[in-house]
């Protein structure tokens, strides 16, 4: 190995030695370090253009952008256009917003350009960073989608950044839930489109239910940038986006099933640590008997029959509602309505409902009015939707713990972007023996900080925990109030969503005390001194030590702890965080804790090992679940893609009668294979019935004789010829264009209907596969095999139904 002693003495000048050391360090640097070094060099080249771009007039700046646009559309690579484009966007930001991108933001944008997850800490300016890579990809004219965490932030970011884009000639669109198709189409036609992930996904689903290509609103999936990527791509990866249709009122049924399940005792079901529930043999017997008594199960039927799958499914959903979902943790009841609570952020999610009849089961449990059950017409998970983009990138404050997941599921690297100013926040944690001791420590920490005017944020993992801490504060002389003041605290949780922006805006003021559920995804920085800016208040908050973040429990994932801590110490501000947890907390259940001698918290190193083990176990389990989801989802995705391609081909086919003829011939072949195989006995009676039912033809069918193969060929040709003649007559009578338009619409409607049914079958199959006692490595192959069989059935049903509709045209019903 080369070492410094091998360099000739005459060559050992300081400059040569430094160059040698630099080359050596670059060789041994990590890939992350080498990447950042490369990005920093590019950032320096962008900054070197500062004088040149500052000298340009607004018109000249716009002309430079137009020139880059022409080069991109003529085939120039985006890599080649990066430096001049970033320099122009940086200057546009300076002129319109009064702030130019700093080096770290340029580095973050370069990571995004390369299709990575940029990990940028709270307050580092992700919104401004996004404009660089959005403008670069917009040059090609294919559209850029920026997915914000919620509607408020999407609208805020679009309006805030719009002047930058406008100066350079880029149009900005905004997708919101209430706008109509014309407005959506116009928004997607813009160079850069802001919105929330769910709206992008739902528009994709709606587009693939349209009957004409010019009715669609999206124009492709070139580049997507996902803000708070961990929430959308990791936490919500398996959340289905669904378009639903009504099934009708079934309130009495849900109440009857809930009453039966409510009567079960612990011997009737088993719960495991993964929050799964299963009926025991005694449970099946009890349910079977109760369903018969209620008249919901026929006397000669069984819960294990195929015909009873749907009924058993409703029973299991009622059992899950009763045993797994807890009020004020998973949902709240507000105004006689069950409202889901985001498990990570504590936000209420009004309008979002659990699917597959689980929400109706909850409404029955809580004796709320039961919403109409819907049938899913089309659905897609966030994971599947965002993997459709040619290029995907994301931004988040915490990605380091999911590096492998981003890589395996999305093919994305994670790049940790250095902060603009050094982090000086101090972090600590204490693990107490009981929850009461932990709450007492939280109170003592709060009292000490409040005495010197330090702003305090207390983070809790759930609404129930938030209420518990609030009760403790009130019992000790604190007053819950919207107004800030001595010994007053504001509450920010899913029950007070409307006050969220105002509460957060003032959480950094001196003496402010804010009690909140999990803060991840709130989307608003906590600025020392509060908002609007007040220099004196900021100095007072800084002098008191900056924001103090107190956690009352550790979250199941380290990333969530980091997000809460990250509220303090933004952009080099002073700050401190401490977690006062206890071995009674939900995270540590099932993890035996060593008994500590005496009073006081556990020894720090022991506590850290215990918490790390519990969090790593939860994270590994969650990762395994999401990885399994991605593999099962990939099977469904391939079927969806095949249907989408077939649907587009039908929708855009100028001569659909050729496809109808092919489907008719395939249908006749199906019937012959089933009822008149060339090497086996014929079932003439059922063949005749099928020909009459599907083809609406009366074709004399004789016994095949000795040469079945020849007879089968002849019969198939004869049936085909008669069917062709019939259709030719219909085309002549109605007109090729008219009959083609009718059958095109028939085929599209049939595909949509069959895919709706297929989606339900596949979801039921996923659950059934999971309940089977199979080795883990056999679950996916089993699902693939049975899903393929279901897809073949769908294809067969499609060609038979199309043929039947075509042959019935003009016949009396």
From Swiss-Prot:
Its EC number is 7.4.2.8. It is an enzyme of class 7 (translocase). It comes from the Bacteria. The keyword rRNA-binding does not apply. HAMAP family: SecA. Monomer and homodimer. Part of the essential Sec protein translocation apparatus which comprises SecA, SecYEG and auxiliary proteins SecDF-YajC and YidC. This is Protein translocase subunit SecA 2. It comes from Rhodopseudomonas palustris (strain BisA53).
